[in-house]
Amino acid sequence: MTSTPIIPADLLPADGRFGCGPSKVRPEQLQSLVEVGSSVFGTSHRQKPVKDVVASVRSGLADLFSLPEGYEVVLGNGGTTAFWDAAAFGLIREKSLHLTNGEFSSKFASVAKNNPFIGDPIVVSADPGSAPEPVSDPSVDLIGWAHNETSTGVAIPVSRPAGSENALIAIDATSGAGGLPVNVADADVYYFAPQKCFAADGGLWIALMSPKALERVAEIKDSGRWTPDFLSLPIAVDNSSKDQTYNTPAVATLLLLANQIDWLNGKGGLDWATSRTADSSSRLYQWAEASEYATPFVTDPAHRSQVVGTIDFDDKIDAAQVAKILRANGVVDTEPYRKLGRNQLRVGMFPAIDPEDVSQLTKSIDWVVSQLG
């Protein structure tokens, strides 16, 4: 093939962004930066204009997730990567248990293992593309797993394992929050970042924390454990109660996040969002199951994610070449997770992505593959 094929316009999605984070940002979100930005950009994050944005985020999330009584919306800078360290310092009393089945679910386990103030964690692993069964152990005081493993497209429902009464349930919902069904009462810490379902930039973490989790934060603080201020959950809880962050936040991220939360709530809340991602994912998986050359990577339909779809290709088809041609035609970020090393495409299907665009994507892929033959 000497030149890049041009996909017919009637096969292309209206918006070609299918990344798994950062993800598609709606035009209305960008417009909101222009409309309200002049009143908050370049102003103190300790004063009312920016604090009102933070308050909008916190109250909007409380509505979106039907936050149980006593739960708090806590936020801080640094994204989920920083929160893993904050949790190791401020939520694990002595020892944790982690379910791992991919790159991101393994990271919290690694952080816990390397923290000098707590014991080595118990790690229950499953191969990429599959899901470990949530379990408990009487020796642990925190159990954690990923609601959605972004690298592989595996979703594990949120629940309290039998025998876990004395442990916090900490769910990494970085790519699942806002796009997968959840009853937040089934977790003590449901934490995430804005660049997936919430269609904003990264660099912020948000945690929905139960009274039990807040008590643990206070308990560990009172124990005198040393913690860097940037990773201090007591400081984050205190600042969040005042609609602030410990250090200066990226205001654009907060504005994009606030607008997306308002949009989701205005459309019908979490029920609407999850029905939309279910629609998108059913289109992708049904196409792959009917295809002669593609198949869902996650073999168990019960664990196929509604927000991140991974599709394996027959060895005769070079998925990397397909992604390259798609990108040249404005359909971007369908490449697989780099460390997984599979001949596949990975498709983000967050609420901002129109299900019709997912259908158009499958048509574009079929056309590209026909040209490669």
UniProtKB/Swiss-Prot annotation:
<comment type="similarity">
    <text>Belongs to the class-V pyridoxal-phosphate-dependent aminotransferase family. SerC subfamily.</text>
</comment>
<dbReference type="GO" id="GO:0019265">
    <property type="term" value="P:glycine biosynthetic process, by transamination of glyoxylate"/>
</dbReference>
<feature type="binding site">
    <location>
        <position position="150"/>
    </location>
    <ligand>
        <name>pyridoxal 5'-phosphate</name>
    </ligand>
</feature>
<keyword id="KW-0963">Cytoplasm</keyword>
<feature type="binding site">
    <location>
        <position position="172"/>
    </location>
    <ligand>
        <name>pyridoxal 5'-phosphate</name>
    </ligand>
</feature>
<keyword id="KW-0028">Amino-acid biosynthesis</keyword>
<dbReference type="InterPro" id="IPR022278">
    <property type="entry name" value="Pser_aminoTfrase"/>
</dbReference>
<dbReference type="InterPro" id="IPR006272">
    <property type="entry name" value="Pser_aminoTfrase_mycobac"/>
</dbReference>
<dbReference type="InterPro" id="IPR015421">
    <property type="entry name" value="PyrdxlP-dep_Trfase_major"/>
</dbReference>
<dbReference type="InterPro" id="IPR015422">
    <property type="entry name" value="PyrdxlP-dep_Trfase_small"/>
</dbReference>
<comment type="function">
    <text>Catalyzes the reversible conversion of 3-phosphohydroxypyruvate to phosphoserine and of 3-hydroxy-2-oxo-4-phosphonooxybutanoate to phosphohydroxythreonine.</text>
</comment>
<feature type="binding site">
    <location>
        <position position="104"/>
    </location>
    <ligand>
        <name>pyridoxal 5'-phosphate</name>
    </ligand>
</feature>
<dbReference type="GO" id="GO:0004648">
    <property type="term" value="F:O-phospho-L-serine:2-oxoglutarate aminotransferase activity"/>
</dbReference>
<dbReference type="GO" id="GO:0005737">
    <property type="term" value="C:cytoplasm"/>
</dbReference>
<dbReference type="GO" id="GO:0006564">
    <property type="term" value="P:L-serine biosynthetic process"/>
</dbReference>
<dbReference type="Pfam" id="PF00266">
    <property type="entry name" value="Aminotran_5"/>
</dbReference>
<feature type="modified residue" description="N6-(pyridoxal phosphate)lysine">
    <location>
        <position position="196"/>
    </location>
</feature>
<dbReference type="GO" id="GO:0008615">
    <property type="term" value="P:pyridoxine biosynthetic process"/>
</dbReference>
<comment type="pathway">
    <text>Cofactor biosynthesis; pyridoxine 5'-phosphate biosynthesis; pyridoxine 5'-phosphate from D-erythrose 4-phosphate: step 3/5.</text>
</comment>
<dbReference type="GO" id="GO:0004760">
    <property type="term" value="F:L-serine-pyruvate transaminase activity"/>
</dbReference>
<dbReference type="InterPro" id="IPR000192">
    <property type="entry name" value="Aminotrans_V_dom"/>
</dbReference>
<keyword id="KW-0032">Aminotransferase</keyword>
<dbReference type="GO" id="GO:0008453">
    <property type="term" value="F:alanine-glyoxylate transaminase activity"/>
</dbReference>
<keyword id="KW-0663">Pyridoxal phosphate</keyword>
<keyword id="KW-0664">Pyridoxine biosynthesis</keyword>
<keyword id="KW-0808">Transferase</keyword>
<comment type="subunit">
    <text>Homodimer.</text>
</comment>
<feature type="binding site">
    <location>
        <begin position="247"/>
        <end position="248"/>
    </location>
    <ligand>
        <name>pyridoxal 5'-phosphate</name>
    </ligand>
</feature>
<dbReference type="GO" id="GO:0030170">
    <property type="term" value="F:pyridoxal phosphate binding"/>
</dbReference>
<dbReference type="InterPro" id="IPR015424">
    <property type="entry name" value="PyrdxlP-dep_Trfase"/>
</dbReference>
<feature type="binding site">
    <location>
        <position position="195"/>
    </location>
    <ligand>
        <name>pyridoxal 5'-phosphate</name>
    </ligand>
</feature>
<comment type="pathway">
    <text>Amino-acid biosynthesis; L-serine biosynthesis; L-serine from 3-phospho-D-glycerate: step 2/3.</text>
</comment>
<protein>
    <recommendedName>
        <fullName>Phosphoserine aminotransferase</fullName>
        <ecNumber>2.6.1.52</ecNumber>
    </recommendedName>
</protein>
<feature type="binding site">
    <location>
        <position position="46"/>
    </location>
    <ligand>
        <name>L-glutamate</name>
    </ligand>
</feature>
<keyword id="KW-0718">Serine biosynthesis</keyword>
